A protein has these predicted regions:
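Cyclophilin-like peptidyl-prolyl cis-trans isomerases
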Residues: 1-125
């Protein structure tokens, strides 16, 4: 999904926006009892989920613009530090009535910098 001035979403293994990895992980955000101070500002990555707070799997979204109403309700986990022009380009693409891009959009390269911290695998539920 691509919603200009809000976010771009990816990570569906089927490419439909409805798929997942076959498991779910615990939602790491304050309304679910997990301290997570990262705010949903432009460039922040967060886990997409269904209504169930523990339903995230492989889908994620990147904030195109600030969305403070998501703070504490979704598991923000990273931030775009280079290449925000690519996020902006995707956010400006033409979409259909379901917010799906008219032309396929792909992230060609992504690097995750953990700054030497070894994070445990998320708890599956």
């Amino acid at each position: 999904r691509v919603i200009r001035n809000f976010m771009i979403q990816g990570g569906c293994p089927e490419g439909t926006g409805m798929g997942g990895p076959g498991y779910a992980i615990k939602g790491e955000f304050s309304q679910n009892g997990f301290r997570n101070p990262l705010k949903h500002t432009a460039g922040v990555l967060s886990m997409a989920r269904a209504m169930n707070p523990d339903s995230a799997g492989s889908q994620f979204f990147i904030m195109h613009k600030d969305a403070p109403h998501l703070d504490g309700s979704y598991a923000a986990f990273g931030k775009v530090t280079e290449g925000m022009d690519g996020v902006n380009r995707i956010a400006e693409c033409r979409t259909d009535y379901s917010d799906r891009p008219m032309k396929e959009q792909k992230i060609k390269k992504m690097t995750v910098e953990t700054f030497g911290v070894d994070y445990p695998e998320p708890k599956k539920v």
